[in-house]
Amino acid sequence: FNVGNRKVWNVNGASNLLELRDRTKTHVLRRLKQDILDLPDKIITPVYLNLKSKEYMALMGEYYDWMEDDREKKSLTVQFSMLMKVRQIIAENKINETCELVENIIEQGKKVIVFTNFTDTLNRIADHFGKKAVKLDGKMSKVARQNSVDQFQENDKIKVFVGNLKAAGVGITLTAAEAVIMNDLSFVPSDHSQAEDR
């Protein structure tokens, strides 16, 4: 259809799907993960924590006061920034418990992946495990990222992979791990399912 002097294509929906399938069937190969990899079923176990640090309590008090104080007058950017600050404090307050969970898994002779959204949290968890851990974040080069993946997959001394949920949550294979821990969650549920499938 035309908009002004321009011709615009309507790309809503699809047509001629059978013809498309016939023409591409000799060139397209589709394999599903469940058809190729023999992986065990996922077991999801929520772990609830009671956060009581002074920093957390102070920030939550500030956040609730802020929420009650006519937040419609504040821009979405300010609202999002405040929410991110709260999320980051929560992530930092979970580090000790996350490290304890990881240590329990390592004691069983298993490898574990830890995902987080925040670089400071990622670094603190990786530093806690020292030479037993590798990390992957968005600042790393492709070569460094692949090195972290290879080390985790192939080196028996490396027991912990700590990754940024966005940077390490897709496009890599970490099948050496038997457990995945989400230190903190994304706003997007599909990020979690992608990361769990590493």
Question: In which residue ranges do the predicted regions lie?
Answer:
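Inter-lobe coupling linker of SF2 helicases/translocases
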Residues: 1-110
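Short glycine-/polar-rich loops that comprise or flank the Walker A/P-loop
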Residues: 42-44, 131-132, 176-179
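Phosphate- and divalent-cation-binding pockets in alpha/beta enzyme and binding domains
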Residues: 58, 121-125, 191
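Short alpha-helical
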Residues: 93, 120, 143, 169, ...
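Alpha-helical structural signal in soluble globular domains
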Residues: 99, 124-132, 198
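Conserved helicase ATPase core of P-loop NTP-dependent helicases/translocases
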Residues: 111-115, 123, 130-168
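A short beta-strand element within the Helicase C-terminal
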Residues: 172-185
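Conserved SF2 helicase motif VI
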Residues: 188-198
